[in-house]
Amino acid sequence: MIELHQVSKSFNVNGKTVEAVKNVSITVEKGEIFGVVGYSGAGKSTLVRCINLLERPDAGQVVIDGKNLSTLSSKELRVARRKIGMIFQGYNLLKTATVYDNIAKPLKLEGVPKDEIETRVNKYLSIVGLEDKRNNYPSQLSGGQKQRVAIARALAHEPEILLSDEATSALDPETTEAILQLLLKINAELGITIFLITHELDVIQRICDRVAVMENGHLVEQGTVLDIFTKAKHATTKRFVGSEASFDIPQDLLEKYVATGKLVSLHFIGDEADEPALALVSRKFDVLPSILAGGIDHLKNGTLGKLLVHLKGDEVEYSKAISYLKESGVVVEEVELL
């Protein structure tokens, strides 16, 4: 569906060349929700804008449904872009147009018949839950409602792909969750492939099938959401999930625990989240486990239980306890303090 082959993009800033995206290759399957996460300046926004050639890559290929977009004529590219919807952090709504007209006007410009416009606007207002707001103006809407209008506008072109550029970063947690649920609904009911970028791990965790991590324009790691959260390999990825593993407990407090034992992050996947493996550790081995924090995350494709545990005991017993936990299906990782 989406294939990026060694895509690179640079800009000239004050006489200096800045490489925003460097040789990035990603394949996104049809119907998948794929996320890209990274710190500010990692190159995420530039990358997502390369997919519909809002930013034309300096090198590499962007292939959508088998077509290399860079080789298309202007007319062919306009047609191809109709199958790629996009939503942004800033909504980009026309302030003097009603909700209905914000969705309808782009369709009019495309030459869509009036009856078809009416049908589509009503359909997608219903999907985003704003049927009763069709005659309202953007100033009368909340941030979440504005984003829903932007989503309906993107869907009205009936795309096969929806690009999301930090679409939830300006929203409060409750509204963010509502928008994420809407994106899941769109993916499930309409079969639309979603490619999103974010700096929020919660967004990746809640709705993505797979994720890529970017740093300084490079793609440094990619895999399933479960693998990234439990088996991170690159230092940048570990920094991202590190705050999750330590539950944002203050560094000075963690240092006190490290001085008297080992801090380990335990992940229980799926049905194993209910298994009493940790409870049996102190009975089988001469170690004293203390649970410092814990929780259960609901991923798109399963459940992930996580605990931050202080294990006190000598090295031999500690090693035996860790081996036992791993044999019980628990993903174990020592917490490294920054």
Swiss-Prot record:
Binding site for ATP: G38, Y39, S40, G41, A42, G43, K44, S45
Principal subcellular localisation of the protein: membrane
EC assignment: 7.4.2.11
GO CC term (a single one): plasma membrane
Pfam families the record matches: ABC_tran, NIL
Reaction it catalyzes: L-methionine(out) + ATP + H2O = L-methionine(in) + ADP + phosphate + H(+); D-methionine(out) + ATP + H2O = D-methionine(in) + ADP + phosphate + H(+)
Domain of life assignment: Bacteria
SUPFAM superfamilies tied to this protein: ACT-like, P-loop containing nucleoside triphosphate hydrolases
Entry annotated with the keyword Membrane: yes
Record keywords: Amino-acid transport, ATP-binding, Cell membrane, Membrane, Nucleotide-binding, Translocase, Transport
A molecular function (GO) term: ATP hydrolysis activity
Keyword Ribonucleoprotein set for record: no
Subcellular location: Cell membrane
Residue ranges the record marks as coiled coil: none
Entry's family note: Belongs to the ABC transporter superfamily. Methionine importer (TC 3.A.1.24) family.
Subunit composition and interactions: The complex is composed of two ATP-binding proteins (MetN), two transmembrane proteins (MetI) and a solute-binding protein (MetQ).
Role according to the record: Part of the ABC transporter complex MetNIQ involved in methionine import. Responsible for energy coupling to the transport system.
Name of the protein described by the UniProt record: Methionine import ATP-binding protein MetN 1
Protein source organism: Listeria monocytogenes serotype 4b (strain F2365)
Gene designation: metN1
